[in-house]
Design a protein with these regions (language model features):
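HDAC/HDAC-like amidohydrolase catalytic core signature
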Residues: 2, 8-365
Length: 365
């Protein structure tokens, strides 16, 4: 990927229209409601004219491969696998490419403490093989890659909120949703989605933000950072019991954030039925109450069947349809504005095909 912009004209939408898509999803669920409303009501609603189509932004670059710590799973080849799958897709030329930039220290401080940033720099300068604050492996270029990963998410926010793109996918690493305010863990250094959410609020005056996390692992860092914040709603559908051991149904927020954390743990072996039920019956009504102005996806593809770090059974088609459900929610309340950021996914072939299915649905809008 060379970072050059491509044509801003999206490819023609396939025959599977929004209306057909809703019917397909509803049939697959065996349910009579989508997003908390009867399908008949959704389909009977007047169809408004769509604005001029905008492209999906693809934000990322080879700089993220410079984080090449001794880790055979969260490896630079993850970037290559996703990029190769996207390049082989029929829609790659319709994506608009944006160059990432490093996040500033002030942007990192939106979610992380100065002491943690100092710890990272000290650990890297000392040549330590992993962060002393957790189990994340590092190398001499890890800080640079992590700064670009967080900065890429901010670039995506700018692209979507300025009207340069309808939505965005950040092809970056290391992932971020396990990183807390003062600790890196679970392959994560900085919490990319959390930083971008705060950035959207501070720079673009966005009010309410929804974060949808479908990684097989619970995003303990994201939950912790926003646990007492009523302006950011965190939803996670994840395997339990599983690493990192957080994310029970009883964890719903605290203080002003009470009711803005929603965890839907599913058992080992769960697949489409269980995960889609969580989206339809738990998330959709919550979104109707919360009414977000911007939506983020912590897009972890280790919930795909066959992933070495997960035991769920989602398929590429499931990610395509889950993306459609998120887009429908964003259409209702956030003018369709969605920023997706890569999290986990460690079977290279499966990661590539799942991410490509996700981006396919994003670019269809």
């Amino acid at each position: 990927m060379n970072g050059e912009g491509v044509s801003q004209c999206a490819v023609e939408r396939p025959a599977a229209t929004r209306r057909q898509f809703l019917k397909t999803v509803a049939a697959g669920l065996g349910a009579s409601a989508v997003l908390g409303r009867p399908v008949s009501a959704v389909l009977a609603a007047p169809q408004q004219a769509s604005p001029a189509r905008l492209p999906t932004a693809l934000v990322g670059g080879r700089i993220c491969k410079s984080h090449a710590a001794v880790n055979r799973l969260e490896c630079p080849e993850r970037y290559d696998a996703v990029l190769a799958a996207l390049r082989e897709s029929s829609y790659f030329s319709a994506l608009k490419h944006f160059r990432p930039r490093p996040a500033s220290d002030d942007e990192i401080r939106l979610c992380h403490r100065d002491t943690y940033l100092a710890t990272i720099r000290r650990d890297i300068e000392s040549g330590a093989p992993k962060l002393t604050s957790g189990d994340t492996f590092i190398c001499r270029n890890s800080l640079l890659a992590a700064l670009f990963a967080s900065g890429a998410a901010c670039v995506a926010v700018d692209a979507v909120l300025s009207g340069q793109a309808k939505n965005a996918f950040c092809l970056t690493r290391p992932p971020g949703h396990h990183a807390t305010a003062e600790r890196g863990m679970g392959f994560c250094i900085f919490n990319n989605v959390a930083i971008a959410a705060r950035y959207a609020q501070q720079k673009h005056q966005v009010g309410k933000v929804l974060i949808v996390d479908w990684d097989v692992h619970h995003g303990n860092g994201t939950q912790e950072i926003f646990y007492e914040d009523g302006s950011i709603f965190y939803f996670s559908a994840h395997q339990a019991p599983w690493y990192p051991g957080t994310g029970s149904k009883e964890e719903t927020g605290r203080g002003k954030g009470l009711g803005t954390t929603l965890n839907c743990p599913v058992a080992r072996g769960a697949g489409r039925e269980e995960v889609f039920a969580a989206f339809q019956h738990q998330l959709a009504p919550a979104v109707d109450r919360f009414k977000p102005e911007l939506v983020f996806v912590s897009a972890g593809f280790d919930s795909r069947h066959g992933d070495p770090l997960g035991r769920l059974e989602l398929t590429d088609r499931d990610y395509f349809d889950l993306t459609g459900l998120v887009l429908e929610m964003a259409d209702q309340y956030a003018d369709g504005r969605v920023v997706s950021v890569l999290e986990g996914g460690y079977d290279l072939t499966g990661l590539g095909s799942a991410a490509a299915a996700h981006c396919d649905r994003l670019q269809q809008g």
